[in-house]
């Protein structure tokens, strides 16, 4: 046992076990004459650990070597005394520390590490503007990894039909962004996302759609594509080993693999590297661009627009066994189960569509999907009767903190998937630094809506998790808010291989 003082324990540490001191029985020690006080005072005081270690070995030879009885007695009685004394002192210090209230203890403050992050907006068909922002400071924006420039946020810049890039460096705030395209009354709004080794996108009509694969990495990527349709899995020639060069974008017409007109979901998996995948749909009735998402057992589709004429739920089962999905609508008057959506069965490796037009009755809602195994889902909506635009409502995260940078005015919808009312507050920071406060209460299982007056960075903080999105004021498009993970007392690091 060490003779140094024990340190105070932090709140999350377990107390160190103190070894029990065992005394040597008198019968185990050979009898010796007592030493006089003058003999003991002449000897140096031994270290406690050293004194405990100096127990003579058994045998006559070792006893004969101890020719100074006075020294022998001093070593034997001082060792245990020192050990017991130090043990008592250490125990007293430990008890005293535990008696101090937690607020009075000194603890090292752990500062969260803000690592760099790169986001990519898949390119749209029309001329698009990129909106990038964060809680403050500046970000790098541009149309490729090699063409980035520093800008104060929030910022708007034209990217036309190119992919939009947003990058933060170490120490900068967490970025968010979106790309908005609006031409001829048809609007697309797609979030900027981080690269991954795979993802899924869904379209209603593969004959008029294409995949867009963006490689924002510094090395080449090789991807495989699998399509899940109403008749099951579709793997045809040309869907394997597709190479995308570093910093390049590859457009893959889906009609080459499936020329049908029923919904399909494309699963894109990168054998090498990381990619960002988008899907672009165009037709006489409108256009839309969506970004890849991941399968999950619980999915949220926030900000379903009100007064739409068509609402079709597209669900895919990427697994190998049949599963069941239930749908709950979070509406202004409270939660309800849409007719025909209480239990939806889906065969493995297939995609189905469920018409919710009458069940939702044109009400603005958020949807929650629950399944036995991970599923993929989106909601296809068409505008008011007589309009031509459409949109895909994509999944959004549930969190106490929601953020997004929007490129235009719109309607904010927040839904509460919990069982208790949620109060929230936040603000919209405009492109010129002006701030607009946003606050309210969302009852349990309900949806709240309010105006987003202009472009800017939107930051919402709730008393409990919320889901949300912004619906465009012009045309028909829905942009999901990004869930921001709550900071913990530790380091949170996102490693970006592009930051060398």
Annotate the PLM regions.
Residues 79-101, 266-268, 325-327, 367-369, ...:
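Hydrophobic alpha-helical membrane segments, chiefly transmembrane helices and signal peptide h-regions
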Residues 144-160, 233-261, 335-362, 431-457:
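Intrinsically disordered, low-complexity Pro/Gly/Ser/Thr-rich segments with frequent PxxP/GP/PP motifs
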Residues 161-175, 262-271, 364-372, 453-471:
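Short, aromatic- and glycine-rich surface loops/edge beta-strands on solvent-exposed regions
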């Amino acid at each position: 046992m060490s003779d140094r003082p024990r340190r105070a324990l932090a709140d999350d540490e377990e107390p160190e076990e103190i070894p029990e001191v065992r005394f040597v029985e008198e019968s185990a020690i050979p009898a010796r004459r007592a030493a006089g006080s003058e003999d003991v005072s002449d000897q140096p005081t031994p270290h406690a650990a050293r004194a405990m270690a100096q127990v003579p070995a058994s045998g006559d030879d070792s006893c004969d070597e101890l020719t100074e009885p006075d020294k022998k007695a001093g070593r034997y009685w001082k060792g245990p005394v020192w050990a017991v004394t130090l043990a008592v002192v250490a125990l007293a210090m430990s008890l005293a520390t535990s008696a101090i209230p937690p607020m009075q203890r000194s603890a090292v403050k752990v500062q969260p590490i803000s690592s760099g992050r790169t986001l990519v907006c898949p390119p749209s068909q029309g001329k698009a503007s990129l909106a990038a922002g964060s809680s403050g400071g500046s970000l790098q924006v541009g149309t490729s990894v090699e063409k980035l420039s520093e800008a104060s946020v929030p910022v708007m810049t034209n990217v036309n039909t190119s992919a939009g890039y947003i990058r933060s460096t170490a120490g900068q705030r967490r970025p968010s962004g979106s790309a908005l395209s609006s031409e001829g009354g048809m609007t697309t709004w797609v979030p900027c996302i981080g690269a991954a080794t795979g993802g899924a996108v869904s379209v209603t009509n593969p004959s008029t759609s294409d995949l867009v694969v963006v490689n924002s990495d510094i090395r080449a990527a090789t991807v495989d594509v699998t399509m899940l349709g109403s008749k099951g899995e579709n793997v045809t020639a040309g869907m394997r080993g597709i190479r995308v060069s570093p910093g390049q974008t590859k457009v893959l017409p889906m009609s080459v693999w499936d020329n049908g007109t029923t919904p399909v979901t494309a699963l894109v998996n990168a054998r090498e590297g990381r990619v960002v995948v988008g899907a672009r749909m165009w037709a006489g009735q409108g256009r839309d661009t969506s970004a890849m998402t991941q399968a999950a057992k619980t999915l949220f589709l926030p900000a379903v627009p009100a007064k739409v004429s068509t609402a079709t739920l597209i669900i895919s089962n990427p697994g190998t066994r049949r599963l069941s999905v239930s749908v709950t609508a979070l509406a202004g008057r409270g939660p309800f189960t849409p007719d025909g959506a209480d239990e939806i069965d889906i065969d493995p490796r297939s995609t189905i569509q469920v018409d919710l037009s009458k069940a939702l009755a044109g009400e603005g809602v958020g949807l929650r999907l629950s399944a036995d195994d991970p599923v993929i889902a989106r909601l296809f909506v068409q505008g008011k009767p007589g309009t031509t635009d459409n949109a895909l409502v994509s999944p959004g995260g549930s969190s106490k903190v929601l953020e997004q940078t929007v490129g235009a005015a719109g309607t904010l919808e927040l839904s509460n998937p919990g069982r208790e009312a949620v109060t929230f507050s936040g603000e919209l920071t405009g492109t010129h630094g002006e701030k607009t406060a946003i606050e309210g209460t969302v009852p349990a299982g309900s949806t709240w809506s309010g105006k987003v007056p202009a472009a800017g960075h939107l930051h919402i903080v709730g008393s409990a998790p919320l889901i949300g999105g912004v619906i465009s004021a012009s045309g028909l498009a829905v942009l999901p808010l990004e869930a921001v993970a709550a900071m913990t007392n530790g380091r949170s690091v996102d490693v970006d291989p592009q930051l060398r």
